[in-house]
Amino acid sequence: MGIETKFKFKSKAASLLVGVSMLAISSTASGLETLPEDKSMSGMKIELVGRDDLWTYKSCDNYNESPLTKSYVDAGKLPPVNERMPKEPWMAKTDQMVDGIGEYGGTFRHVIGGRPEGFNWLAGQSQGWGGINIQLMESLTRLGPLWQIKPDEANPLPNLAKDWEWSSDRKSLTMNLIEGARWSDGDIFDTEDIDFWWNDNVQDANVASRLPKDALGAGTTLEILGPYSFKFNFDEPKGNAVLAQLAYMGGAPGPSHVMKPLHPAHNSDATYESYANGMPASVLPIVTLGAYVPVVHKVDELMVMKRNPYYWKVDEECNQLPYYNETIYKLTSWDDRTTQALAGTGDFSNMENPGNYVEALKQNKDPNSPVKSVFGTRLIAWDLMMNLSSDFGVSSDYERELRQLFRNVEFRKAISHAMDRDTMGQSVARGPFFHPHAGGFVAGSPFHNFEDSIYYGYNASGANSILDGLGLKDSDGNGIRNLPNGGADLVIDILHSSTRSTDIKLADAAVSMFEAIGIKPVLKPSDNTDAFTDNGNWSMFIAREHWVVATKNIGDRLPTTTQNPAWHRDNGGDLLPFEETLVEKAKGILATNDLSEVASLARDIQRVRTENVYTVGLIQAPAALLINKRIKNNHPGAPVYMYEWAEDGVMLSLIHISEPTRPSS
């Protein structure tokens, strides 16, 4: 089964983004084999552009605005648009808009499965995902649109920081902010917000910042140079990978004029708990730099976000962005997001649930379908992770012994050999959608090469031999292996999401595979798996784990801080030898400005990571972006996920809806 489109990948980097037919593959238990190449369902051709082709920063003599905000100006509720714009707004270039300058008005209909925890993203709160976070946050740099940039120019893009400069020794980075941008309440955005973000959030161990304390390197300090300039000082040379850490979400400052008075460092009556909850989901509107402001929240029903009248971005005809007036998020489930999009009652879906793929293929063939779907390359994957922390979250001697077992690479190899990826894939959806995954970078990553992925494929006999050699034998004859020397039965809990259907199906399929090698699995479904990984109270975990870009959230995938990755928390003094190698490679990526060196180090990381089975890769699949045909300026080649999720990759502020009115001057 294939998909035909008029687009074909053209660039060398994009030619690596392949992927989709599942193969039944065997492997010997002793030899090293590499992951076999897959076949792609995507036939897209993308003309990559230069980084300066997307946007610039430029002033206009006069600005246009939507009829909605103009009515507020006329009523005396807002200053004129010229007074709301920064000195030099971010300006989108028309040549990269597939449908050209947009039209004002209309409602973007979205469906998500998340729920807003609160709006203090500085303290790590989730706003519900699915686009809410991306629409209200703005970060210093930006990664999402990099999927369309030539590989030799694919460094992080400017955003709130319009430019920057490295010192000659690369031990300091000076960044210059856009001048005169305003928060949605009209307050000026400046380095006071940067100072609060860094010193009172990132550097405060009591705040669960999205950017870990040492993500830019231990000893990194911030120096404020003026209202719109600041400098990072590092203990050792750094490179452009640092800029990637300053993109969504870690590099998103919050409104200091709102949040600073709520922080314990500035308010003796405040606690860190009260600070974290200082922007509750029940109190709206909030203050943001994003294109849209949350104004209505009905629990488990909907979220409404309306255009930010102070948004600091424009198009080349000096029309203030965004184009459409509001987004309505229906709060149901992630699977319902795709169902609604296919039915025409939702406008957008990152189709990540392979169970819906067959229906999407049918819709593609129907000229009357309200939605168009474009399948990309294999960018989503599922892994089985083992808790590698020696003591974090351990509550018994049995659990401590299990952890030591998980830290043994031979045991991890045995588990990988036990996984029948073909059966797993077909249990999720029948068809040519799946391919084995070895862990690490997905096949669609520009940093992935199949020859770098060491693969311990399905071989139950080999798995049993390895376990026998580890002394894990059924010493009491009940059909379940025991820990060495007549120890307890080998019973292992497997954490997985109870709300994502693919995760549920994979966990169910894994049960018989564990039983076939004498291990008793106990499934542990949860609607809040983060709570378990945060406190370390888990053994194994099946989840989606897609690493696409080497420089993006590197601390989430490698142990560059003591609290990451999720499968090895509290790792100070606890790293395995191969993890120390991974850390050194990661430091190399963070220290270089040479993209070819980044690619070489990424290849090394993939080899080390997969040979040592850092996580057990299960399956990987393509994703499809579903867009209602009434939505304009959605680039047809935008991936569901690469440098960032599609909501950032397609630049939602440039989306417009086919019914509304043209901008008025």
Residues covered by each model-derived region:
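A structural "hinge/loop" feature
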Residues: 96, 112-134, 160, 188, ...
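Extracytoplasmic/periplasmic ligand-capture domains
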Residues: 30-59, 71, 75, 146, ...
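Surface-exposed binding/hinge segments that line
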Residues: 212-271, 427, 638
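Mature extracytoplasmic/periplasmic domains
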Residues: 260-263, 432-452, 624-629
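N-terminal lobe/hinge region of extracytoplasmic solute-binding protein
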Residues: 65, 71-75, 79-166, 199, ...
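Charged, glycine/proline-rich intrinsically disordered loops and linkers
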Residues: 50, 257-279, 393-401
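Glycine-rich and polybasic anion-binding loops at the starts of cofactor/ligand-binding domains
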Residues: 618
